[in-house]
Amino acid sequence: MSSCSASGCKATVPVALEAEKLCILHFTMEIERHCAEMRRETATGRTARERQVEIITYVGGRGELLARTATSGLHLPDELKARILNTFLTLMNLRENLDRAALRHPIGRTEGR
């Protein structure tokens, strides 16, 4: 196992996250940051369909990788388990918000009609 690439972090990178080069803590922080950015981006409901598909793919991919990491047999402290669960909730909420925004502003509908 290698060390986390985050500045100043000496934690080891689990096998499932080696391609990311991040420890579990920094991986979850990165997901949370990206989700916050995407949530702001999609809040208006005017996100292009292609971008919506990218976000849905991101949510699924990150969720799958996080699940694989969390269930790999590592002995994790309770605080890190809670952080992982919170990150799953963040991913789920982003997807739900994307769906809700799309319902409020269906693609192809224009203002003033």
What are these model-predicted stretches?
Residues 1-108, 112:
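Intrinsically disordered, low-complexity regulatory regions of eukaryotic proteins
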